């Protein structure tokens, strides 16, 4: 993990006709900057800084958003056009003379693309596919990497190199008229060549790499001149001055030449003169580490001096240290000392900047120190900059001389919300009550999507935020990340934990509820037979609990899961009630949505505190906890939802029978009240603060047949009195935000049911609304958010797609978006996990 610019310069430069073209920025909503500079003067020829914000069709059909181009890959200039690689999508084309937009077929070719481009005047290739340069229309797909070989085309195909030439061809248009067009036809092929990774043409030679092999082919003689192995996968090939350069994913660069060499040229590792241990700084580092308790994460050394404190902190801890110094002389000195110590660039970096305006990301530092302060040097750092840089929930400022160290530990952000359960809390409000984050949004951090997660149609568990930790469940592990800087803190291996969710059924947690929650200092995660208690801070296992036996005395299986104030709540799942997949198909036996028994355990010991055995069945979505009570609907399970349900010809569909709402004492399990008149709902949500219990449906895309929708009712939590009951149209799971119920389709006063103004619109996107006090998040082609606090409009954060249920949450004063796009073939520009903050 490293700090980089919000606008990384990934648009590799191209030079043509005395002009250099380059680009910066990968997130369209942050702005993409494409620039042309004159080589002789360095003056700007043109700048395109608007097409990142372009409102346009997105990769998924029917999806439009304010999300335009990105800059990711080597640019190509050819015949009056600049081709801009956009990462995972097809290239955009600009006019090379003025930078004006020509085309970007993001939706039309929504499952094509990549960063590799080869220009041929009237045509270009992108990741093996031939396109017409005039209009960007696709013509033909080749099987592997493509390179230019003079006027011809070379491509890797089925174990060899296939060379093509241009040819005039004919075809019939849609009206049957014969038309001429320029295409390609095979010229010659050579087999037995490694390939498939990268391919370039150099004069009459073709260079191909495949895995750890590289080969050079003489196109004139159509022979393999030589091939060799390298260490790692050979991703980069380049030729210049009669030499071939090969770079691998293991960090090696090889140079090959046709000239005879006396021997292999290597540069021996430089012997480093390690600075001696300076007692003052060694003692200071020891005191800082012991008093702060911070030994991992990001450390900022504001006013680092000559880097001595940074050297000692690096020696005594696992911190990654960023030094800031205003004095250019000290910057140079610190860099040299750190380089001599073998630490520069790997463990420690030095930047020159104002100590009061570092331009580093907000909330970055787990630890803030000052090397100059160790010896009593003057260091003036504004309090607001110190606060801005320090991570909430435990970030530490430790500045001063040995023995006079001032320690300042940052707590939670005032007004920050939490997201501890699937729908924010055990009350199912779908609202974190975060009062800090609001639009407009901008990037705080991003990282590779390196935790394998269930494919998006599997609707895996929502991410959680608790006490500064982002907890995400993957296919084979649960991971805790520092929510404020994206650093992995721990990972607990659970092979196959979400295997059942890695399918195209579009059910998942929409029916089962989550198997993951947090409470206090614990993470709870159930794996059918047992529930693990894991330490939130360390990832260490603290306990393992089995559910109680069924009424029949058989071993129980975990279904629903929640934790509140040290108590663990769960259900014994009904393994006979198996719902039908909502999309293509799925193995559903491990995706259970109904239970026969509700119970409570001690959250530390696992001791059974009480149980409620249902008269009929308890739907997992129809459980809400808060205000010292457990609310649930005891109702016959809906037969029409199941795989085995078959309706006889002419038979009326079996309705979902009504049931009863019960309020149970959360401590004892005793029934406080029960209402059994006209109980129609399939979900419950609770506002404990307002003493309101909402009953409704989850009438979303790919719903179960029993989710008929069209109605809501509200009960008073003290006695079950029905406050109001209305027929209303909505198309998402309801969200409770203070005094208002929000859903796609409308908003209603929580206490009266009266309509409230809510002009909500979004583009294509399944999934539900996840809100804070000031905004709500959802999929709207890309990531969408609705500004509740100010404009009452929908906006996009572009360049990525959300999952198909809940994976973007407003909590901790920020927006957290771990990747949930696995399995999607649509060429959204970026696939990453990230956090957003309110733009200043």
Predicted regions and their residues:
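A short glycine-rich, Lys/Arg-flanked "PGG" loop and its adjoining helix->strand segment in the class I
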Residues: 379-395
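Beta-propeller blade signature
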Residues: 33-43, 93, 99, 486, ...
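Short loop/turn segments that connect beta-strands within beta-propeller blades
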Residues: 39-41, 95-98, 133-136, 167-168, ...
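S-adenosyl-L-methionine
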Residues: 333-360
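Repeat-blade elements of multi-bladed beta-propeller folds
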Residues: 4-35, 60-91, 105, 109-130, ...
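Surface-exposed loop and turn segments in beta-propeller and other repeat-based domains
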Residues: 1-3, 46-68, 106-113, 176-186, ...
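Extracellular/periplasmic ectodomains of large secreted or surface enzymes and adhesion receptors
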Residues: 2-3, 50-51, 135-136, 142-307, ...
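Conserved SAM-binding motif I beta-strand of class I
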Residues: 320-325
